[in-house]
Swiss-Prot record:
Subunit annotation: Homodimer. Heterodimer with ARL6IP1. Forms multimers. Interacts with ARL6. Interacts with prenylated RAB1A and RAB3A. Interacts with SLC1A1/EAAC1. Interacts with RTN2 (via first transmembrane domain). Does not interact with VAMP1, VAMP2 or VAMP3.
Taxonomic classification: Eukaryota, Metazoa, Chordata, Craniata, Vertebrata
Annotated region (Targeting to endoplasmic reticulum membrane), positions in chain: 136-188
Cytoplasmic side of membrane: 1-35, 78-93, 136-188
Biological function: Regulates intracellular concentrations of taurine and glutamate. Negatively modulates SLC1A1/EAAC1 glutamate transport activity by decreasing its affinity for glutamate in a PKC activity-dependent manner. Plays a role in the retention of SLC1A1/EAAC1 in the endoplasmic reticulum.
Protein name according to UniProt: PRA1 family protein 3
Location(s), subcellular: Endoplasmic reticulum membrane; Cell membrane; Cytoplasm; Cytoplasm, Cytoskeleton
Species of provenance: Homo sapiens
Similarity-based family: Belongs to the PRA1 family.
GO cellular component, as recorded: cytoskeleton; endoplasmic reticulum membrane; membrane; plasma membrane; presynaptic cytosol
N-acetylmethionine PTM positions: 1
Region (Required for homodimer formation and heterodimer formation with ARL6IP1): 103-117
Length: 188
C-alpha cells in the first residue's frame, strides 16, 4: 500500500481556542495514550512543519552540531527498534512501557551527543519539538474528523509516515485488535 502524506490542517483547527484543549485524565493511561496517538496521526503534517521550522532555526545557528545530533538520534532509534524486534526482553519492554522506551532512546542519544559537546543543540533542536508535539497531542481534544481519519489509518485504508513510526513503536496494534474484536462481535 502506498504511503500518503496527511494534509496540512488549518491553523484554527490545529490551534483553536482554549475550549478545544483539556488536561488529560492521568488516571486512565490508555485513554490518554489513545488521544496522543490519534492526534499524532491527525496533525502529523502540522507537527512536521513546526518541527522543521524549529530544527531549521537551530540548524542555522549551529549546523554541525545539529547534523551530528540528528545522525546520533536516528542511529540510536534504529538500533533500539532493531534490538527490540530481535530481543524478546526489549520487545516486551517496548510494548508495555512505550514512554520508557522512547525516554531510553532519548537518554542514550543525549549521552552519545554529550561526548561530542552538542548537548544543548540536541536538547533544543531535536527534543524540544518532540516535547511540544507530545504536549499538544496530550492536550488537544479530538473532533469527529480526527476520529474518522484515525479509523481509516487503523484498518489500513490509509498509510501515513506517522502511522509507520507508530507501528514501529507498536502503538497502533492495540487499536487494530480492538477494532477487529468489535467487528467480529458485530458479525455474531
Amino acid at each position: 500500500m502506498d504511503v500518503n502524506i496527511a494534509p496540512l490542517r488549518a491553523w484554527d483547527d490545529f490551534f483553536p481556542g482554549s475550549d478545544r484543549f483539556a488536561r488529560p485524565d492521568f488516571r486512565d493511561i490508555s485513554k490518554w495514550n489513545n488521544r496522543v496517538v490519534s492526534n499524532l496521526l491527525y496533525y502529523q503534517t502540522n507537527y512536521l512543519v513546526v518541527a522543521a521550522m524549529m530544527i531549521s532555526i537551530v540548524g542555522f545557528l549551529s549546523p554541525f552540531n545539529m547534523i551530528l545530533g540528528g545522525i546520533v538520534v536516528v542511529l540510536v532509534f534504529t538500533g533500539f527498534v532493531w534490538a527490540a524486534h530481535n530481543k524478546d526482553v526489549l520487545r516486551r519492554m517496548k510494548k508495555r512501557y512505550p514512554t520508557t522506551f522512547v525516554m531510553v532512546v532519548m537518554l542514550a542519544s543525549y549521552f552519545l551527543i554529550s561526548m561530542f559537546g552538542g548537548v544543548m543543540v540536541f536538547v533544543f533542536g531535536i527534543t524540544f519539538p518532540l516535547l511540544l508535539m507530545f504536549i499538544h497531542a496530550s492536550l488537544r481534544l479530538r473532533n469527529l474528523k480526527n476520529k474518522l481519519e484515525n479509523k481509516m489509518e487503523g484498518i489500513g485504508l490509509k498509510r501515513t509516515p506517522m502511522g509507520i513510526v507508530l507501528d514501529a513503536l507498536e502503538q497502533q496494534e492495540e487499536g487494530i485488535n480492538r477494532l477487529t474484536d468489535y467487528i467480529s462481535k458485530v458479525k455474531e
